[in-house]
Amino acid sequence: MGKPRRMMNRLRMGALPPRYSFVLNPHVRERFTKCPSCAASTRIRKLPLVVHVEHPGGPRLVLLNKTCRLCLMCETLIVDRVELENVIIAAGLSATVKPPDYVVLGTIDRRTWRRGLGDHASLLDIREHMADFKKYLKVDVVPAHGERSSRSAG
């Protein structure tokens, strides 16, 4: 007898079907030229992202066109945390040099992103043209050469 499948009833913000697995890369020196999920080569793509940012004046929904790494085989999207935080700070969404709390919610179609640049996109419009992420992944980097021994030479 098989186990019954559980249906995950997860609330979604976007109306479009979920797309991409998402990785926020916390490692400064790792650029993931190979996918952490399937080891296929990743491609550089510029994609419009929807980011929820905590702001002193109230929470904001920000549309950012960000250069990311994308695995076409398993549809994993990799965004560098440091680069994303620098864009958030440069956009004036942080009152200090420290980046605010944020969550990358999903992707949005390019046409809606362009309308959002001129403040012509409403929240309803963003939700209609947004795709949430299928899942959020966490990546741990293991050094290729292992740790060097600390033995002293003779």
Model regions and ranges:
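A composition-biased, non-transmembrane "mature-region" signal
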Residues: 24-26, 35, 89
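Long, contiguous alpha-helical scaffold regions
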Residues: 87-154
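Short cysteine/histidine-rich metal-coordination sites, predominantly Zn2+-binding motifs
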Residues: 49-59, 86-97
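Residues immediately within or flanking Cys/His clusters that coordinate Zn2+
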Residues: 29-32, 68-71
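Iron-sulfur (Fe-S) cluster-binding segments and ferredoxin-like electron-carrier domains
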Residues: 78-86
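Short Cys/His-rich local motifs and their 1-3 flanking residues in nucleic-acid-associated proteins
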Residues: 37-40, 72-76
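Short recognition patches in nucleic-acid-associated and regulatory proteins
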Residues: 31-64
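Short Cys/His-rich Zn2+-coordinating modules
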Residues: 10-24, 48-60
